[in-house]
């Protein structure tokens, strides 16, 4: 069954550029799982450099990065070495070698036309629940800043049980859940931060 937003992330044990890993061993941590169409491709190379340049920021947020494509582990190794040689960048996170496409199919990542993995992103919370998923066109590189913003928004919700409004940035107000009864809606009328009975901002 394909991955579903808000449901448990399908578990897997796979070989990677850093050896075997099992997703369930990451329980208790935030995970960013992202797929790319192929090694030695221009857009993917810029993305892996960009992810690496922000790797410390992900680590400070307690987020583990895991890459994925259907290339072999030998292809991953050669690509990592090539990036090191030409850009001076050491890729610090594992890249799954999903040559049998098992994980890619579980996460609905296969482009049926090309047979390659699409440019997907999944944020998995410490309970192994898929909290965010998005697919980018093959021609469009990912915005790392936006991915980090979404992680911070999800962690804000995790910590404070507040939603985030449009264009939210860290440090800005969150939104309390709307009242679920008529009586509680009237009680809210004079509270600080209330714009209307169903919309209350909280710092």
Curated annotation (Swiss-Prot):
GO biological process, one term: response to oxidative stress
Catalysis performed (reactions): a hydroperoxide + [thioredoxin]-dithiol = an alcohol + [thioredoxin]-disulfide + H2O
Binding-site residues, substrate: 119
Keyword NADP among record annotations: no
InterPro entries in UniProt: AhpC/TSA, Peroxiredoxin, Peroxiredoxin_AhpC-typ, Peroxiredoxin_C, Peroxiredoxin_TDXH, PRX_1cys, Thioredoxin-like_sf, Thioredoxin_domain
Molecular function GO labels: thioredoxin peroxidase activity
List of catalytic residues: 44 (cysteine sulfenic acid (-soh) intermediate)
Domain of life of the native organism: Archaea
Subunit-structure text: Homodecamer. Pentamer of dimers that assemble into a ring structure.
Role: Thiol-specific peroxidase that catalyzes the reduction of hydrogen peroxide and organic hydroperoxides to water and alcohols, respectively. Plays a role in cell protection against oxidative stress by detoxifying peroxides.
Family membership noted in the UniProt record: Belongs to the peroxiredoxin family. Prx6 subfamily.
Protein name: Peroxiredoxin
């Amino acid at each position: 069954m394909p991955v579903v937003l808000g449901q448990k992330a399908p578990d897997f044990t796979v070989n990677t550029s850093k050896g075997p890993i099992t997703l369930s061993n990451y329980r208790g941590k935030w995970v960013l799982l992202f797929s790319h169409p192929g090694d030695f491709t221009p857009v993917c190379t810029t993305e892996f450099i960009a992810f690496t340049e922000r790797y410390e920021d992900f680590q400070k947020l307690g987020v583990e990065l895991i890459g994925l494509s259907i290339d072999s582990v030998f292809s991953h190794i050669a690509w990592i070495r090539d990036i090191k040689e030409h850009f001076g960048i050491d890729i610090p996170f594992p890249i799954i070698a999903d040559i049998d496409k098992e994980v890619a199919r579980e996460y609905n990542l296969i482009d049926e036309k090309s047979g390659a993995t699409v440019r997907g992103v999944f944020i998995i919370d410490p309970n192994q629940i898929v909290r965010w998923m998005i697919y980018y066109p093959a021609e469009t590189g990912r915005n790392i800043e936006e991915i980090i913003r979404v992680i911070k928004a999800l962690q804000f919700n995790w910590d404070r049980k507040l939603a985030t409004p449009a264009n939210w940035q860290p440090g800005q107000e969150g939104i309390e859940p709307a009242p679920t009864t008529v009586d509680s809606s009237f009680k809210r009328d004079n509270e600080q931060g209330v714009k209307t009975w169903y919309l209350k901002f909280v710092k």
